[in-house]
């Protein structure tokens, strides 16, 4: 049986890490695409040469033409300019919007049946633009944000409580940025909600608030430490978890930037919410009832995403006609 083809648009740090993870997990064959000649070919060859050591048989190739992604079952998009110190995700808008238009056209022509995962920032606006540019069904185009943000939240909580990350569950909703909403009420350690752990004396509310703030600034913290780039290991792992749920029809419940059409009171926008991912793409949107501060924070986050989308519409009004 032929292996699935997984196309990676963008061969930077995340793209290379994605390619290696696909091989290690034997998820399929890999096509690394990039406009920079030699870069995808070099990374593909380097990773392929690790396969005898790591023991995987995935085939890896590099390409500078979109024809190479033809028939891909999954496309993961990392193309675009990364954030630099002092640069907000929003600063990237006009540059990366043009990239999404080009990538969307390539996917539309060569991989119209693919499940597409967007990682490019500013995420919620870029995945909206990518879906418009590609013309793919909205349930087949998602943004990777919530899995990463929730993983950061889980890691910080596990570190605080000195427990295994496997026993910590956490949900982060809303836009992928400063307005994201880590939901303390729905986050647990071995099924015990965080508010109960505060009552049990495991931590204080003030300390929990600090962890929530650190989660919101998780990406910026790494950007400031690296000084020459942004996170790539955790983002790649997060996207692979989403791809694996689709390829293996695992029906995992994960927070992603999904297209909302009335859910959560949001219309024709991509916002981070929990969904079920199976072999049809987004098979169900899990609509959590939000109230009080959580609802206010989510609404603020949606408004921030709306502002980015409106800016996209002004920069590229032709996207609306697609």
From Swiss-Prot:
Signal peptide from the UniProt entry: none
Disulphide connectivity of cysteines: none
Keyword RNA-binding: no
Catalytic residues, chain numbering: 176 (proton acceptor)
Binding residue positions for NAD(+): 10-15, 34, 96, 119-121
Keywords assigned: NAD, Oxidoreductase, Tricarboxylic acid cycle
One Pfam family cited in the UniProt record for this chain: Ldh_1_C
CDD domains (UniProt xref): LDH-like_MDH
Membrane-spanning parts: none
InterPro entries, per the entry: L-lactate/malate_DH (IPR001557), Lactate/malate_DH_C (IPR022383), Lactate/malate_DH_N (IPR001236), Lactate_DH/Glyco_Ohase_4_C (IPR015955), Malate_DH_type3 (IPR011275), NAD(P)-bd_dom_sf (IPR036291)
Function of the protein: Catalyzes the reversible oxidation of malate to oxaloacetate.
Family: Belongs to the LDH/MDH superfamily. MDH type 3 family.
Protein name, per record: Malate dehydrogenase
Gene assigned in the entry: mdh
């Amino acid at each position: 049986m032929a292996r699935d083809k997984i196309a990676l648009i963008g061969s930077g740090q995340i793209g290379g890490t994605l390619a290696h993870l696909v091989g290690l997990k034997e998820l399929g064959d890999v096509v690394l695409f990039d406009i920079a000649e030699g870069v995808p070919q070099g990374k593909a060859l380097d990773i392929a040469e690790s396969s005898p050591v790591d023991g995987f048989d995935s085939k890896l190739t590099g390409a500078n033409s979109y024809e190479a992604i033809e028939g891909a079952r999954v496309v993961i998009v990392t193309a675009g300019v990364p954030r630099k110190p002092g640069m907000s995700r929003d600063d990237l808008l006009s540059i990366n919007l043009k990239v999404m238009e080009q990538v969307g056209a390539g996917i539309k022509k060569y991989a119209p049946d693919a499940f597409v995962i967007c990682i490019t920032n500013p995420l919620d606006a870029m995945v909206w633009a990518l879906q418009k540019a590609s013309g793919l069904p909205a349930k087949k185009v998602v943004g990777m944000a919530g899995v990463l943000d929730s993983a950061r939240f889980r890691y910080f909580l596990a570190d605080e409580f000195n427990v295994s990350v496997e026993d910590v569950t956490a949900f982060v909703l809303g836009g992928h940025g400063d307005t994201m909403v880590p939901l303390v009420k729905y986050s647990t350690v071995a099924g015990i909600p965080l508010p109960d752990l505060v009552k049990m004396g495991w931590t204080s509310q003030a300390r929990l608030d600090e962890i929530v703030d650190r989660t919101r600034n998780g990406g910026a913290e790494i950007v400031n430490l690296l000084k020459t780039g942004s996170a790539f290991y955790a983002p790649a792992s997060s996207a692979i978890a989403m791809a694996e749920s689709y390829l293996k029809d695992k029906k995992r419940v994960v927070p992603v930037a999904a297209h909302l059409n009335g859910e959560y009171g949001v219309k024709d926008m991509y916002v981070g919410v929990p969904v079920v991912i199976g072999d049809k793409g987004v098979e169900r949107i899990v609509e959590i009832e939000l109230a009080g501060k959580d609802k206010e924070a989510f609404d603020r986050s949606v408004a921030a995403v709306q502002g980015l989308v409106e800016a996209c519409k002004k920069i590229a009004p032709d996207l609306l006609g697609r």
